Amino acid sequence: MKRELKITLAAALIMLAVTPCFAASKSKKSKTKVRTINVAHTVTNVPYDFLDEKGNADGFEIAVLKAVDELLPEYEFKFHGVSDEELLIGTESGKYQVGTKGAWITEERKKKFLIPSNPLAASVIGIAFRAENADQIKDLESFAKFSGKLIPISPQSAQFSVIQEFNEKNPSNQIKLVPSDVFDIADSYLWVLEDRYDAYFVLKLSYEKNVLKETGPYHQFADKLAYVPYKGIPTWPLFNKKESELAAAYDKAVQTLKENGTISALSQKYFGEDVFNFVSE
């Protein structure tokens, strides 16, 4: 009886000693401040950033950022669907800490925003051309040899700089880069079919949506057009200039998501392929 009493008293003393430790740990965790991060995103950029049928934020970039959020207990991401203009102005001013819109890097954006080390997604870009020339045009290099006669591109477009870069690397096999007065030429596919130009530099997703998809406005020409990808252009989240600590946390989380296969799996879900396979180091 005395032995049982001693054991009971000993157990009680241990519980009294340990309980304050658990209480302190629980109190410390509950007092940890979780900072709300306002993330602006575009609403119609399928499959990168958009609103689903219920009005919820969806898309590949959104999904990656949600996965990033799960790895950062000190932050809670709140998503805001906004216009392209509101995203840029709001992120620069600090109304939003992050903006995501499938953005390519430009010199102007480097001046206005903090660009992290790791991209968020990638846009696959290439050329659409007449299917009858498919035996001669296999890539951008063979197109340059074929004629290099490309639909004019606005100097304000990121595509312009991509072709500039190609020409710099291929001084003896250049593409005819003609500046356009407008950002987007509505009849580009028709101009190619009419032999006015021999190719149209366009995003793969745009080609699939407008030509290959049965409801696409140019689907009737699907058998007369062909497409070859050139490369994947990384897209980046835009951070407010003051958010260096947040950007560093993002970079660390994205690296983890790359290594554990999450980003590749999400790319397969939203694009049907791993778009980073087209991105050269």
State each model region's role.
Residues M1-L9:
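Bacterial N-terminal signal peptides that target proteins for export
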Residues K28-A103, D181, N260:
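Extracytoplasmic small-molecule ligand-binding "clamshell" domains
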Residues T42-T44, A121-G126, E214-V254, E273-E281:
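Periplasmic-binding protein-like
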Residues V43-V46, K54-E70, I127-Q174, V178-D184, ...:
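Bilobed "Venus flytrap"/periplasmic-binding protein-like clamshell domains
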Residues I62-L72, A131-A134, E141-K145, K149-P152, ...:
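Extended ligand-binding regions for polar small-molecule ligands
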Residues K66, K78-A144, D223-P229:
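Acidic, polar ligand-binding/catalytic clefts
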Residues E86, E92, T100-K112, S161-E165, ...:
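A ligand-binding cleft/hinge motif common to bilobed small-molecule-binding domains
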